[in-house]
């Protein structure tokens, strides 16, 4: 059934995904992540220190920054001025950071910081979910590179640092249909939209569901979650396939 999408894509199918690891020569822990027409560049950078409030606690920190380039949307999105970040950007980068930290053992990381930067090059809906899914791949690449440094003290065990994987997808209710992976057009038409963030092992990290001048019932919620799980499972397979080849 594709009546809700009015397109060739079935309501329970994700958009085409393309992943290119090592996209930047300057940072091997970089990922160009494409979900349909949405394109996000995710990079992970490691520092050998932690924020002042975490010093001496024997654990590391993972955080994220999110930004949309002016040309990523039409009309042009204005740049944040003088380092000031707007409310939407703050909310999204906190979500990305929380989602990534949920699967990281900060003690196993040691007193090191990893910043995952997610820069939206082109936006067509789902930029925050694409940032989380691509950001995890960049994070995994950075942790693997740390582990490859023989003189590192203490050493890093990737399997200890990364306890699981994480991916995110959007779902929504449009008319009578529940739809997976909303692009901008579908998101604009949705009566209800939800972001589903889950681990690769099938545990929930965060759910963000909202009715737009509408409500939804238990049956619709169950279907939203069912489709979300389908999408997460597919994205997890794609993540694993990419990381195996790196």
Swiss-Prot record:
In terms of domain of life, where is this protein from? Bacteria
Q: Does the keyword Membrane apply?
A: no
Assigned keywords, A-Z: Nucleotidyltransferase, RNA-binding, rRNA processing, Transferase, tRNA processing, tRNA-binding
Q: Where in this chain does the entry annotate a coiled-coil region?
A: none
List, alphabetically, the HAMAP family matched: RNase_PH
Q: Where is this region: Disordered?
A: 67-87
The reactions it catalyses are:
tRNA(n+1) + phosphate = tRNA(n) + a ribonucleoside 5'-diphosphate
What biological process terms from GO does the record include?
A: rRNA catabolic process; rRNA processing; tRNA processing
* Protein family according to the UniProt entry: Belongs to the RNase PH family.
Top-level EC class: transferase
Provide the binding site for phosphate.
88, 126-128
Q: Short name of one Pfam family for this protein?
A: RNase_PH
Q: Which InterPro entries match?
A: ExoRNase_PH_dom1, ExoRNase_PH_dom2, ExoRNase_PH_dom2_sf, PNPase/RNase_PH_dom_sf, Ribosomal_Su5_D2-typ_SF, RNase_PH, RNase_PH_bac-type, RNase_PH_CS
What's the protein here called? Ribonuclease PH
Report the protein's function.
Phosphorolytic 3'-5' exoribonuclease that plays an important role in tRNA 3'-end maturation. Removes nucleotide residues following the 3'-CCA terminus of tRNAs; can also add nucleotides to the ends of RNA molecules by using nucleoside diphosphates as substrates, but this may not be physiologically important. Probably plays a role in initiation of 16S rRNA degradation (leading to ribosome degradation) during starvation.
């Amino acid at each position: 059934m594709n009546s809700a999408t009015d397109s060739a894509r079935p309501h329970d199918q994700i958009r085409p995904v393309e992943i290119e690891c090592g996209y930047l020569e300057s940072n091997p822990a970089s990922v160009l992540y494409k979900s349909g027409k949405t394109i996000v560049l995710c990079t992970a950078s490691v520092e050998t220190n932690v924020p002042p409030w975490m010093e001496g606690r024997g654990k590391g920190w993972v955080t994220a920054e999110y930004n949309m380039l002016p040309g990523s949307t039409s009309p042009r999105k204005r740049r944040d001025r003088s380092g000031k970040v707007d409310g939407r950007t703050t909310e999204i980068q906190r979500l990305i950071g929380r989602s990534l930290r949920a699967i990281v053992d900060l003690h196993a990381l040691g007193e090191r910081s990893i910043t995952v930067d997610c820069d939206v090059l082109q936006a067509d809906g789902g930029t925050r979910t694409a940032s989380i899914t691509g950001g995890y791949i960049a994070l995994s690449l950075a942790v693997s590179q740390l582990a490859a440094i023989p003189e590192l003290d203490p050493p890093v065990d990737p399997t200890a640092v990364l306890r699981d994987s994480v991916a995110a997808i959007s779902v929504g209710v449009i008319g009578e249909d529940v739809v997976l992976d909303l692009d901008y057009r579908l998101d604009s038409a949705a009566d209800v939209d939800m972001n589903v963030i889950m681990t690769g092992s099938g545990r929930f990290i965060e759910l963000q569901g909202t009715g737009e001048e509408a409500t939804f019932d238990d049956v619709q919620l169950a279907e939203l979650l069912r489709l979300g799980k389908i999408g997460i499972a597919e994205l997890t397979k794609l993540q694993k396939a990419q990381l195996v080849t790196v």
